[in-house]
Amino acid sequence: MTRVLRVIGQLSERDRGLYLRWSLSKDSARALRETWILITHAGGTTVSIAAVALPLWLRPWDRSVTWVAAASLAISHLAVQVIKRFVGRPRPSKPIGIDHPDRFSFPSGHATSSLAVTLAYAVAFPHFAVPLVGFGLLVGWSRVALGVHYPGDVLAGQVIASATVLGVSLIG
């Protein structure tokens, strides 16, 4: 058990070090900060829900495609909320230009939801896979850049999203 705790401590220190190198500072260029804020909001709750609700309503493609995205979003969100409360990792203390949506950092909900939706659509529409998945990954990165998550939080959220989309796709 002591070895496991030591490894976790080492990973946490490494994560904090990467965070300090990769996150913006208050002195970063305004255009850079605003770009990352725009990207992070584009992967937020409203946009993620709209990305599944609008296609369900407008029916631009087979509804089963959107149901995979909706189920992936819902299941991954539930997993994130349970894990956040179980782990209880506090957020970094220096956000840039945005507020913390809640007090827990691990895993990142934005990274999870944005990748869950974009990956579900990427599986259904492989011609658009690169920009879709790229955008989902970029939203995750924005959370580190803006100082609201550690890199490990984002990576964990992206693993949850990927596993959820895989599971839902296999079942559906």
Regions found by a protein language model. Name each.
Residues I96-G172:
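Membrane-embedded catalytic cores of phosphoryl/pyrophosphoryl-handling enzymes
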Residues L56, V80-G88, A122, S169-G172:
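Membrane-water interface at transmembrane helix exits
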Residues A70-F86, V130-W141:
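Small-polar-interrupted transmembrane alpha-helices in polytopic inner-membrane proteins
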Residues G44-T46, L73, A111:
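Transmembrane alpha-helical core positions of polytopic small-molecule transporters
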Residues A29-L32, W61-T66, P92-S93, P126-P131, ...:
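Membrane-helix interface segments
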Residues A51-L78:
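Interfacial segments of alpha-helical transmembrane regions
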Residues M1-E13, W61, V65-V68, V133, ...:
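Multi-pass membrane proteins that catalyze or facilitate reactions on polyprenyl-/lipid-phosphate substrates
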Residues M1-V47, V80-P101:
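N-terminal transmembrane-helix/juxtamembrane module of multi-pass inner/ER membrane proteins
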